[in-house]
Amino acid sequence: MSEPLKPRIDFAEPLKEEPTSAFKAQQTFSEAESRTFAPAAIDERPEDEGVAEAAVDAALRPKRSLWRKMVMGGLALFGASVVGQGVQWTMNAWQTQDWVALGGCAAGALIIGAGVGSVVTEWRRLWRLRQRAHERDEARELLHSHSVGKGRAFCEKLAQQAGIDQSHPALQRWYAAIHETQNDREIVGLYAHLVQLVLDAQARREISRFAAESTLMIAVSSLALVDMAFIAWRNLRLINRIATLYGIELGYYSRLRLFRLVLLNIAFAGASELVREVGMDWMSQDLAARLSTRAAQGIGAGLLTARLGIKAMELCRPLPWIDNDKPRLGDFRRQLIGQLKETLQKSKSSPEK
């Protein structure tokens, strides 16, 4: 009974080898050589995308400022004044039997009620978009936790928000895979691999379809104004589709907020990756010599649409990326180039026939 307890063994993690320190051989410098030493230049690397992602996630949090409180207080006071004045007008119209004024008060009450209802609905949808960021933080904590009891309820809530029925095959596989001895990290990890991947696959198909449409539209069209309007319309529809797929109902202001956050994310972290992904393929295959200028512009527009969809997918997704399952531009680049080449070959072969 006096033997010490053995340390805990986690079979899900790889074995850790004890580091062995390697010593270099001694090197002696003369006094003349030491005078020629120069300080080593430090390579200042730019911030990685994790800093940009954190900045965008922080932008999703509600910000409480003094000016905002003053504006909200003024609007509340103005609304109370309008309601009080409307009640007084209604009482005066009823006492004087002024039916025209009474009808106007009723119409005004209906309009105000509709406006208040729309504002409440927009606020609820915007609050739901902000809550998704808190859910990602909670999921990140559960993925690093060894506690028991919270993971199953959290995953069931996510499935209900996404509109996944209890009889869905992916959800049934998840129920069959979990048991009482698993902790929250394992339960959430199983949900991410069995259920969340189904939604991610649907989002990838939507991104591929919208990116291909943008590529082909820019490649065959010669009107810049029409191209800009088409790309803007398709990008907004892509954001709506991805948000609906992940169980988020966007209103007017929440849609604008999500679109702004996606563009902010692209401006932070997208330029370097876009140049790297596109340049790697263009320099290797010399596409500039094989395709026309319009086709090259179409590929660029399609890649930007794909980048927009990836970032919208990341902001609407309830779970953080794990096991390098985040989609990359390279996943869509080859598909776009193949579809564009196939379309150009068909267009060249049709006049010959």
From Swiss-Prot:
Compositional bias ranges of the Basic and acidic residues kind: 1-19
Predominant location: membrane
Stretches of the chain forming a coiled coil according to its record: none
Region: Disordered, residue numbers: 1-35
Subcellular location(s) per record: Cell inner membrane
UniProt membrane topology term: Multi-pass membrane protein
InterPro entries attached to this UniProt entry: DUF697, UPF0283
Keywords for the protein's UniProt record, in alphabetical order: Cell inner membrane, Cell membrane, Membrane, Transmembrane, Transmembrane helix
GO cellular component: plasma membrane
Annotated TM spans: 70-90, 100-120, 213-233
Pfam family, one: DUF697
Homology family: Belongs to the UPF0283 family.
Protein name, entry field: UPF0283 membrane protein YcjF
Organism: Salmonella gallinarum (strain 287/91 / NCTC 13346)
Gene: ycjF
